[in-house]
């Protein structure tokens, strides 16, 4: 939730990084309160992107909305699994549910296999959502330059998309990690 997201004040982050983290936090809150366009949160693993995306989902669910949250590699695995004769889910149903969700959160874009099939499916999702102007949240650890050019062009449209890079290091490790009390 937004309430348990740590702005990490005890870690003595630089003022620039602290302000950046607060700015991204406010952008995520604003998106949750007024979902429109696309919100992209980029940064290293463990910097808080997925936490903020999940906080958006929780807030929206609390307001009665039904956002769809998917981890991109898992989504592609689920789509592939629908081709199995034993699958109880239809490919079209799953794909259309994601493409046309009133609010979609795509977590970990760029960590999926870059097969031609995966690139095409992701492009179709992005293109549908772009053309329909559907609110979308995207988290990614990589660079925009590493994405399919067709997806990147939609993400770089500043009329639709706000891109924020979280400068904070991972909270999971390194010298800025807060000390934890050992349990007995």
Show where each model-derived region lies.
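Walker A/P-loop nucleotide-binding motif
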Residues: 35-53
């Amino acid at each position: 939730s937004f309430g348990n997201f740590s702005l990490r004040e005890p870690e003595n982050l630089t003022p620039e990084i602290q302000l950046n983290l607060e700015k991204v936090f406010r952008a995520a809150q604003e998106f949750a309160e007024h979902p429109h366009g696309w919100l992209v949160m980029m940064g290293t693993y463990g910097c808080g992107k997925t936490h903020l995306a999940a906080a958006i989902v929780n807030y929206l669910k609390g307001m009665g909305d039904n956002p769809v949250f998917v981890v991109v590699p898992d989504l592609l695995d689920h789509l592939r699994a629908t081709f199995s004769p034993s699958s109880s889910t239809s490919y079209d149903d799953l794909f259309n549910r994601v493409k046309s969700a009133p609010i979609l959160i795509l977590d970990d874009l760029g960590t999926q296999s870059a097969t031609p099939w995966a690139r095409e499916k992701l492009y179709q999702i992005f293109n549908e959502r772009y053309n329909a102007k559907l609110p979308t949240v995207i988290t990614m650890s990589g660079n925009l330059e590493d994405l399919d050019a067709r997806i990147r062009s939609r993400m770089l449209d500043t009329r639709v998309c706000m891109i924020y890079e979280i400068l904070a290091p991972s909270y999971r490790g390194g010298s800025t990690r807060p000390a934890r009390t050992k349990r007995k």
